[in-house]
Amino acid sequence: MTTLFTLSHRFQRIPRNIYRYLFVMAALGFTIDGGIYSVLLNLYVLRLGYGPEFIGTLNCVGLFVFAALSLPLGAVRRFSSHQMLIIGLSCIFTGMMGLPLGQWLPEAFHSGWLVATRILTHIGLAFFFVHTAPFVMSITKGEWHSRALSLQSATLALAGFMGGLVGGVLPGLLGDWLHLPTSDPTPYQYPLLLAGIFLAPALLILTRLTAVSTPEPPAAEADEMLLPQPSKQRVLPFTVTQVVLLIIAVRILQITVVGVINTFANVYLDDGLKVSTDLIGVLTAVSRLVGVPIALSVPYLVSRWGNYRLVIWTTLFTVALMIPMAFIPHWAVAGAATIGIGSISSLRYLSFLVFSLSLVPEEKRALISGAGEMSIGLGFAFVSFVGGYLITWYGYPALFLFGAVLTLAGTVLFWLFFRKVK
């Protein structure tokens, strides 16, 4: 009873701005960041008649644009983080609504339309996610910084779970209603349109957010947030420029396994193992659901082990899950990897984010955030482009081994670069 009362008290103390912000993040999680789009987009493209190489190229182009914009956007000072989020979400909304509409164009325009709308969506994602951490810090204060980021990860995971379930079920239901087989693209087109519509209220709420800092929590709550604060700069043997370059190099490699899962897991399950869309949706959803308690446990895990160790251990864990996929072509093995890698991604992402932000002065946080997002985009773009051709030329096992080796290399580099950081 005491525990329930304490949890209730903590949620009552969450500032209104954070509740509104979390609603926006929930809409993103339900639709594009782990939800409907994550389950159905690649399957939709397959049913339009394209193969893994085009899917890889399509994802690569969007992610490369995301990567190219992330670092410059992190250095922008003319616009506030709030304005950048509004611009970003507007582009995401337009791109998501536009992509499935291309099915009604002449077939000769399909590929170009898919690429153009995917690029617009990733332009929006770059504007948005580069400035999420700085924006959270502008609407919170002190101990709320890392707590809000932890709540953000949990919200994305829970919303992604719900969106994954909905995305897995809708094509079958719509196919029955429209008397169309699930091999037809139309039962996938309408859920993608629905995902875009769900973002409209989030965009409205985002415009009403104000960058007003909340009061410092009382001393009694100071121990509740156990994440190290980025304002406490570490002693480094590197310049800020060197830190940026190191973060980019390490993260591009470390993110490879996650990129393989995010881009090709549903393609492998559908095209390689002939798994039903319902089961693909369930596996994706469960990976997000398991991520909720993991995200909420971040403060405790960081206080127990530290961000540096968590980055290394979580990355090695993803490598250990990917290797069996190369040798055992079974949906249970692929499902375990999808769930394990997807669920732990919030812990890996947040621990790396807080660790990297703590390496630089406060005025350089947006730059570091941009460098981190750019490296994720570059890593995913590289995996998407190379992965599509690896599958075509050598099969899925070659892709899985490729991802595991590069991620392991990134972990070794992270250990070498930062093991002596105090």
Where in the sequence are the language-model features?
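Juxtamembrane intracellular "pre-TM" segments in multi-pass secondary transporters
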Residues: T2-I18, A211-A249
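Helix-loop boundary and gating motifs at the non-cytosolic
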Residues: F5-A68, V243-S276, I280-L283
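Intracellular juxtamembrane helix-capping segments at the cytosolic ends
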Residues: F127-T140, L347-V360
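Hydrophobic core of transmembrane alpha-helices in multi-pass small-molecule transporters
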Residues: G95, A108-F128, I252, V333-L347
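C-terminal membrane-cytosol helix-exit motif in multi-pass small-molecule transporters
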Residues: G196-A219, L413-F418
